[in-house]
């Protein structure tokens, strides 16, 4: 299951991807992978129920609306058609914070578990703390947090994610300042390619900020080992 544009349309495995062979105006075209997984599970359960298979009633798919909305909003896909529906219903579930991991994550993000959450809260508070771990450290940490039902473990992991995000913000600020200085030193060009010994996990963020500031195409290259 994936939502990214595929390089090849011919694959030798079962692929659920609306960007392959589907019409561009299909209502599911903008679903992210979290939304696609939610729809896939919903469809499989429906088929099982219609076939009289008791497994079709073994999972309440609505119990996963919070995770579907979290992925949808944090992935910054357009909040229209089915994405909007997932986000609207999922935000209510997110606000209830029935999962211990989400309660801890909401708390370290400076909000009150059980309160009303908006898409902005997910995009600018919760999402960055989840993504920071994948950018700088171990991407399995937020997964462990969301799967855990131990309050103490969740608080510890959420605090670690918060610390990693603060580190990411500091690195991002440094990289953006250095890359911006390089770009400005080049003068008024049609576009910029800047590079340095920068962490590859934040160069995309820096490029976006410089692009908006200079109103020019920008490529920021970092370094990982011996490779740029």
Residue ranges and their predicted role:
Residues 4, 25-28, 113-114, 208-209:
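A generic local secondary-structure boundary/capping motif
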Residues 1-8, 98-104:
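An acidic intrinsically disordered interaction segment
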Residues 9-11, 206-207:
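Short Gly/Thr/Asp-enriched flexible loops that form oxyanion-binding sites at enzyme active sites
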Residues 10-53, 61-73, 81:
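Short alpha-helices
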Residues 3-6, 19-21, 197-198, 223-225:
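Short, ordered loop/turn segments at secondary-structure junctions
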């Amino acid at each position: 299951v994936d939502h990214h544009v595929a390089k090849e349309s011919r694959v030798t495995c079962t692929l659920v991807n609306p960007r392959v062979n589907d019409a561009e105006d299909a209502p599911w075209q903008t679903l992210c992978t979290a939304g696609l997984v939610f729809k896939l599970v919903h469809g499989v359960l429906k088929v099982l129920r219609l076939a009289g298979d008791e497994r079709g009633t073994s999972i309440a798919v609505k119990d996963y609306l919070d995770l579907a909305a979290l992925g949808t909003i944090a992935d910054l896909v357009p909040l229209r058609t089915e994405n909007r529906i997932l986000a609207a219903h999922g935000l209510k579930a997110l606000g209830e914070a029935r999962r211990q991991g989400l309660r801890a994550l909401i708390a370290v993000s400076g909000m009150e578990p059980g309160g009303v959450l908006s898409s902005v809260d997910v995009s600018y508070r919760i999402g960055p703390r989840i993504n920071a771990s994948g950018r700088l450290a171990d991407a399995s940490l937020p997964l462990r947090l969301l799967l855990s039902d131990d309050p103490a473990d969740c608080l510890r992991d959420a605090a670690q994610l918060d610390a990693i995000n603060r580190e990411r913000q500091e690195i991002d600020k440094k990289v953006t300042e250095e890359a911006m200085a390089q770009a400005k030193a080049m003068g008024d060009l049609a576009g910029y390619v800047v590079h340095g010994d920068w962490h590859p996990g934040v160069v995309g963020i820096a490029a976006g900020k410089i692009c908006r500031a200079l109103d020019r195409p920008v490529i920021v290259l970092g370094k990982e080992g011996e490779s740029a």
